[in-house]
């Protein structure tokens, strides 16, 4: 029985570890949406702002189709269509500038908005 590997075996082990960056113990493959590609790490396809159930944080398997609405191409626009304003240009492809819009412009904050009555004191 030998205590240590020979120089040739040690060099072969070092070469193999340089070529294989992933350990074989508990190694799993995660498949992406494209079946011909695979990876050893998760590929997220949704933002972290989606609800808890779509991230499968509740420990239950949820089908992929549950994360996407059936009518995703038929979504309604949530912004109101404004009536176009006249800019004086023909055809009117530009929007009205701030001076020509109806109503008052929003009041800008004071340049001393975050300043207190006393000066800032830094202590070390």
Swiss-Prot record:
InterPro entries: TAR1. The keyword Chaperone does not apply. One of its GO terms (biological process) is regulation of cellular respiration. Residues 80-124 are annotated as: Disordered. Residues 111-124 have a biased composition (Polar residues). Keywords: Mitochondrion. It is found in: Mitochondrion. One of its GO terms (cellular component) is mitochondrion. May be involved in mtDNA stability or mitochondrial gene expression regulation at the post-transcriptional level. Encoded on the antisense strand of the nuclear 25S rDNA. This is Protein TAR1. It comes from Saccharomyces cerevisiae (strain ATCC 204508 / S288c). The lineage of its organism: Eukaryota, Fungi, Dikarya, Ascomycota, Saccharomycotina.
């Amino acid at each position: 029985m030998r205590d240590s590997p020979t120089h040739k075996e040690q060099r072969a082990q070092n070469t193999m570890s340089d070529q294989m960056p992933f350990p074989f113990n508990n190694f799993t493959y995660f498949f992406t949406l494209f079946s011909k590609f695979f990876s050893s790490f998760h590929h997220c396809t949704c933002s972290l702002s989606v609800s808890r159930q779509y991230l499968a944080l509740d420990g239950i398997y949820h089908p992929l189709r549950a994360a996407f609405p059936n009518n995703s191409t038929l979504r309604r626009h949530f912004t109101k269509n404004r009536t176009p304003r006249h800019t004086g240009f023909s055809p009117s492809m530009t929007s009205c500038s701030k001076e020509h819009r109806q109503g008052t412009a929003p009041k800008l904050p004071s340049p001393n908005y975050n300043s207190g009555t006393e000066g800032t004191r830094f202590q070390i």
